[in-house]
Amino acid sequence: MTRPEASGPPDATRLGHLLGPHGVQGGIKLYVLGDPAQVLALKRVYVESRGWLSLRRAEGMPPNLVLYLAGVSSREGAEELRGLQVYATDAELPDLEEGTFYYHDLRGLEVYGAGGERLGTVSDVMDAGHQDLLVVDYGGGTSFVPLQAPYVEVPLAGGKPGAVHLTADAPAGLIGPEPGEEDGAAES
């Protein structure tokens, strides 16, 4: 699995990625990273490498959505968008319920261990099927931490995440080089 590069507009939230065509009239399935209801009210979305596209309509197709985008009117046109990331600006998204946050709010946060030691910095949140992963950069590389794991805590300060904390239940060596690696390179 490769890490998707951030290619959306500034101050935007990644909504998900396009899975492939639905029907013959340009519908395309969207794998949604959050609450699909937040996408239904949007008037436009930003599609990676294509820019802003008007959202003609969106339909629920649990667990995904089907989007009908301006300028995409055929199955072939929808196929060209397969795999691309989809974004919306924060200002266009609905207000969140208290105690919740957008994943992009985690980018740049420090990650701390149970003893308060700094372990790294969140550079991205990656969808990996049924589990979302924090991409954590540490001094010598990158580690992936399951966001929904019971040992991951994201306390809110002023309604926004302030840091990521791993509890004492976190597996040893979760962040850092794999066993047998030295200075980021595997030994042979």
UniProtKB/Swiss-Prot annotation:
Residues 98-174 form the PRC barrel domain. It holds the Pfam family PRC. It is found in: Cytoplasm. The PRC barrel domain binds ribosomal protein uS19. HAMAP family: Ribosome_mat_RimM. Residues 169-188 are annotated as: Disordered. Belongs to the RimM family. Binds ribosomal protein uS19. GO terms for biological process: maturation of SSU-rRNA. This is Ribosome maturation factor RimM. InterPro entries: PRC-brl_dom, PRC_barrel-like_sf, RimM, RimM_N, RimM_N_sf. GO terms for cellular component: cytosol; ribosome.
